[in-house]
Design a protein with these regions (language model features):
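A glycine-rich (often HGG/GG-containing) alpha/beta subdomain
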Residues: 1-145
């Protein structure tokens, strides 16, 4: 049996479908994520003011391989999960996505378990049980009914 995931872990999920696209989005959530952001993304330093913001720049994925990226910053406890949340928007190349995932994994970030963003939102008081049930119904729906 795999060890139970900790609420102290920083988690990561792709917010876009697998495959080539104009833009891809990786979403990270975790307690104190903003204080660790420069470990994950050295070229970005979110302001300590605790404000929502968008930072644009270039990220070096490999020596000589740079790409434009935007970092959306949502400080907790006012984010969707009640924790610090970062969204990284970048060109939707599967190769870039793979490089980013590997980078975050080496920094101790792990992939989410199914429903983990919703679970954290509930545990942090951002969603009530009725809202969680609505999310479950929407995710599990098979048609527009």
């Amino acid at each position: 049996m795999a060890p139970r995931a900790s609420r102290r872990d920083c988690i990561l999920a792709s917010a876009t479908p697998v495959g080539a696209a104009e833009r891809a989005v990786l979403r990270l959530s975790g307690p104190d994520l903003l204080s660790r952001a420069t470990e994950f993304l050295p070229s970005f330093c979110p302001h300590p003011r605790g404000l929502r913001e968008v930072r644009e720049g270039k990220l070096e994925f490999a020596p000589g391989c740079m790409s434009p990226v935007a970092l959306f910053v949502f400080p907790g406890p006012h984010s969707a999960t009640g924790e610090d949340v970062l969204e990284l928007h970048y060109p939707g190349s599967p190769a870039l996505t793979e490089m980013l995932l590997e980078h975050f994994f080496t920094q101790g970030v792990r992939l989410t378990e199914p429903g983990e963003f919703t679970r954290r939102a509930f545990l942090n008081g951002r969603l009530d049980l009725t809202q969680v049930e609505a999310v479950l119904g929407l995710v599990g729906s098979r048609n527009a009914q």
